[in-house]
C-alpha cells in the first residue's frame, strides 16, 4: 500500500512541474489584471537546475527579504520522458527593497535536500517543517532568519515533530505554529498539531484530528480574533488507502481554539460550468481580520481521474474487462504528455469572508494556474513563487 501511495503522489507532483514550472516569481497588487514579474532564480552551476523553477519549496518573508529554500524539479528531462526528480537544499534571498530590479543571492543551505514540507513566516523568520526527498521523510523543524549584520542565514533548530510528516500545510497565529494534513510516517493522515514558540520545551501539542478524509497537499490559514484563533483548512486529497476509493474534498473546514472543535465552514464555489472545484495543491493567505485569498490548485475531474487510475486498472483486470483495461492503460501512459491547457489548473482567485461566510470571485489569470507554488503577502502585494 505504501508503494502505491508514493507512486500516485509522484504522478501528482510531476504534473505541477510540467504544467507550470517557472522560476520567475510574480507580484500581484490585488487589483484585477495588474501583474508584474520579479527576477528569476539563477542557475549557479551546471548541476544546479533551480533556474528551471521549483515546486514544493519553503518560502517566506523575514527581515526585509524574501527567502526561498529547498524544493524540487526535473534536472535532465521532464517526467513525461522518464526524468528523475531532483531535490535541493539551497537557500536564496531577494531583498524586498527594490525587488523588481534586484537579484537573487544564494545565502546558505538547508540541513538536507527537501521538498513537500510546510513553511510559514513569523516575526523571527521563516519556519520550515517536515518534507521529504527521494530517500526519506522528515520530522525536523527549524527557523531560518536573515542576519543582516553577519550577511548570513541563521538556522535555529526547533522541536521535532512527534512523527515524520510531508505534504502537509502550515499557518501561524499569535505565538503558535499550526500544521495539518499530509503523510504521517508515510501514510495519509488527519493530523493536526501546534507549537508554542514561547514555550519550545513543551514541544508539539497534538490537537483533535480534522474530520473526514485525510488530506495531502491541503491549504491552511488562520485568523486571530479577541476571542481566540480560527484555523481554516481546504483542499488536499486522499489516495487509495485500505481499499477505499481516492477522494478529493471540496469543502472548507474551520477549527476554533476557543472550543477546541472542528466544523464544516463552507462548500467551495463550483466551476463556471457547475463542475466541482478543489484547492488541492493551491495557495491561500489571510489578509486583514476577515478575508482569505485562495488561488491555484489542480482541476478536480482531471486529478480524480489520475489518482483513481491504478484502482480502476485493477478492477478492470479483475473483472476481465480487457477493452477497458487497454483504454485505461493508454490513458495512464499518456497522462503526463498532454499540452499544459489540458490539465486545467485553477486560474481563478477567490476571496472568502470569514465574517459573512460568503465567497467572492476576484480575478482569473494564467499566472495563478499552477500547483505546488507558494503565495506570500507583502504589504499590499501578493507574491506567487514557483509551482
Task: Please state what every model-predicted region is.
Residues 24-387:
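Kelch-like beta-propeller repeat domains
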Residues 18-19:
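C-terminal motif of bacterial Sec signal peptides marking the signal peptidase cleavage site
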Amino acid at each position: 500500500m505504501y508503494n502505491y501511495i508514493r507512486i500516485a503522489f509522484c504522478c501528482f507532483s510531476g504534473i505541477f512541474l510540467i504544467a507550470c514550472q517557472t522560476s520567475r516569481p510574480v507580484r500581484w497588487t490585488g487589483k484585477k489584471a495588474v501583474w508584474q514579474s520579479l527576477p528569476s532564480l539563477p542557475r549557479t552551476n551546471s548541476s544546479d537546475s533551480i533556474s528551471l523553477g521549483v515546486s514544493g519549496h519553503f518560502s517566506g518573508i523575514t527581515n526585509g527579504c524574501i527567502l526561498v529554500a529547498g524544493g524540487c524539479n526535473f534536472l535532465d528531462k521532464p517526467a513525461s520522458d522518464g526524468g528523475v526528480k531532483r531535490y535541493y537544499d539551497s537557500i536564496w534571498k531577494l531583498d524586498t527593497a527594490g525587488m523588481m530590479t534586484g537579484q537573487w543571492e544564494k545565502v546558505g543551505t538547508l540541513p538536507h535536500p527537501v521538498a513537500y514540507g510546510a513553511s510559514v513566516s513569523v516575526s523571527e523568520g521563516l519556519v520550515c517543517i517536515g518534507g521529504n526527498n527521494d530517500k526519506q521523510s522528515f520530522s525536523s523543524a527549524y527557523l531560518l532568519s536573515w542576519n543582516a549584520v553577519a550577511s548570513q542565514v541563521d538556522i535555529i533548530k526547533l522541536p521535532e515533530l512527534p512523527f515524520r510528516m510531508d505534504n502537509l500545510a502550515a499557518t501561524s497565529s499569535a505565538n503558535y505554529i499550526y500544521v495539518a494534513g499530509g503523510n504521517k510516517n508515510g501514510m495519509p493522515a488527519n493530523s493536526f498539531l501546534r507549537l508554542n514558540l514561547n514555550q519550545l520545551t513543551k514541544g508539539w501539542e497534538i490537537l483533535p484530528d480534522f474530520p473526514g478524509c485525510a488530506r495531502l497537499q491541503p491549504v491552511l490559514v488562520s485568523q486571530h480574533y479577541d476571542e481566540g484563533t480560527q484555523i481554516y483548512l481546504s483542499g488536499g486529497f486522499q489516495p487509495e488507502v485500505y481499499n477505499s476509493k481516492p477522494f478529493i474534498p471540496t469543502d472548507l473546514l474551520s477549527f476554533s481554539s476557543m472550543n477546541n472543535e472542528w466544523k464544516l465552514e463552507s462548500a467551495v464555489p463550483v466551476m463556471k460550468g457547475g463542475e466541482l472545484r478543489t484547492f488541492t495543491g493551491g495557495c491561500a493567505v489571510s489578509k486583514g481580520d476577515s478575508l482569505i485569498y485562495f488561488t491555484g490548485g489542480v482541476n478536480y475531474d482531471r486529478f480524480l481521474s489520475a489518482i483513481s487510475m491504478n484502482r480502476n486498472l485493477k478492477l478492470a483486470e479483475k473483472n476481465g474487462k480487457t477493452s477497458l483495461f487497454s483504454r485505461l492503460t493508454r490513458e495512464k501512459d499518456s497522462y503526463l504528455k498532454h499540452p499544459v491547457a489540458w490539465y486545467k489548473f485553477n486560474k481563478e482567485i477567490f476571496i472568502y469572508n470569514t465574517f459573512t461566510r460568503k465567497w467572492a470571485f476576484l480575478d482569473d489569470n494564467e499566472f495563478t494556474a499552477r500547483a505546488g507554488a507558494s503565495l506570500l503577502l507583502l504589504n499590499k502585494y501578493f507574491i506567487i513563487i514557483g509551482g
